[in-house]
Amino acid sequence: MAKYDTHLKCSFCGKSQEQVRKLIAGPGVYICDECVELCNEILDEELATVPNAAAPRRESTPSRSPRSTPRSRPLSQVPKPRQIKEFLDKHVVGQHEAKKILAVAVYNHYKRLSLLDSDQRGDDNVELQKSNILLIGPTGSGKTLSAQTLAKLLDVPFAVADATTLTEAGYVGEDVENILLRLLQNANMDVEEAQRGIIYIDEIDKIARKSENPSITRDVSGEGVQQALLKILEGTIANVPPQGGRKHPYQDCIQIDTTNILFICGGAFVGLEKTIEQRVGKKAMGFVRDGEPLPKEKRSADILKQLEPHDLVKYGMIPEFIGRIPVVAVLEPLDVAALADILTQPQNALLKQYQKLMRMDSVELRFEPAAVEAIAQEAYRRKTGARALRAIVEEIMLDVMYELPSRKDLRECTITPEMVEKRSTAELLLHPSSLPTLSA
């Protein structure tokens, strides 16, 4: 097998990498900085000869597409914490305390960026450091949705990463730099825009080490990943391979400063409440006023509110990692009432989505209040949070969505509690013109 050629040269002019200032690598080809400048001159000459051609051509370039807000947003345009929470309320049901914590943390972060952009640091030489966020809550409680909604409000690049796929450098899996690559891609490869973005790292509890004590064997997908994430969370100049580092080792890296990137980590941390109970010294017994004990999920959420950093260390997170995520928000499990609200209240509510789908076939879809309650009850029994709602509605609507597009005589479809509980047939209302007429 032939060895790699260490004497790289431009595929267009043939000059070696020693003869040019920069050699850019592509899939099996290379181009030098001189050829890039020559190509730009040729394009500029062609565009100059065609009337009104320059503007559309520049707008169509994805890497130069402007965002709807200016890159240096003045402080007066940063949404206030109350405005951020009100926006979250439109999309995320419940979790008021967690949304308040998120709103304050995000506001302070982008207020800090506005101060850096305006160069009004003052004479006190006080440097404002960022505060990354940790969201703790059961699956389907709104952790990812909250982070996505924040990115939508602030109009900044946003990327979601799964911590379970990350491994220490040199082992099979993804490098931590791939997280930054996703953010860079979502920013249309605009480095300056990516450096102001938000990264949400999901399943962060899955990289906890197996025991509180350091192990003599390497934990490449647990403690090793935590160690690799330390500098990125705190702020460093990271070298990001634009095509991914594992399959394309010979490429120029893009440098990204992570100092101003806001990291939001989320995880379920199953069993963490037991660690807190051991520290407190007694099991928390919650009672409501009429003497009935609190539900197990509600009691677990109350225990988690007594969380201290040492509890996370005992769970398997290293102290250095916890120290870089100072803001902690606990999300409560969703009860039946919250699940019912998720179906109908948010701006992008699930039932509104199906009603819009049915209107495209000229059919009005109705859900009886008792049917909504029955869907929420079934989702609560499945113990997967809001994610169970779509699965249940899909099961209920399967036959309806299969038959309706082929029938032009229908005007209205009503989902009843019997259909939810027994999967019976929906109530259909025909168009008046489709009803049979009685002959005299």
From Swiss-Prot:
Protein name (record): ATP-dependent Clp protease ATP-binding subunit ClpX
Function: ATP-dependent specificity component of the Clp protease. It directs the protease to specific substrates. Can perform chaperone functions in the absence of ClpP.
Species the sequence originates in: Thermosynechococcus vestitus (strain NIES-2133 / IAM M-273 / BP-1)
Annotated residues for binding of Zn(2+): C10, C13, C32, C35
Coiled coil region boundaries: none
Highest classification ranks of the organism: Bacteria, Bacillati, Cyanobacteriota, Cyanophyceae, Acaryochloridales
Subunit structure: Component of the ClpX-ClpP complex. Forms a hexameric ring that, in the presence of ATP, binds to fourteen ClpP subunits assembled into a disk-like structure with a central cavity, resembling the structure of eukaryotic proteasomes.
Domain ClpX-type ZB: 1-51
Keyword Chaperone attached: yes
Name of the coding gene: clpX
The keyword Transport is assigned to this record: no
Compositionally biased spans, kind Low complexity: 62-74
Ranges annotated as spanning the membrane: none
SUPFAM superfamilies: Glucocorticoid receptor-like (DNA-binding domain) (SSF57716), P-loop containing nucleoside triphosphate hydrolases (SSF52540)
Ranges where the record places region Disordered: 53-80
Similarity-based family: Belongs to the ClpX chaperone family.
Alphabetical keyword list: ATP-binding, Chaperone, Metal-binding, Nucleotide-binding, Zinc
GO MF annotation, one: protein dimerization activity
UniProt-listed Gene3D superfamilies: 1.10.8.60, ClpX chaperone, C4-type zinc finger domain (6.20.220.10), P-loop containing nucleotide triphosphate hydrolases (3.40.50.300)
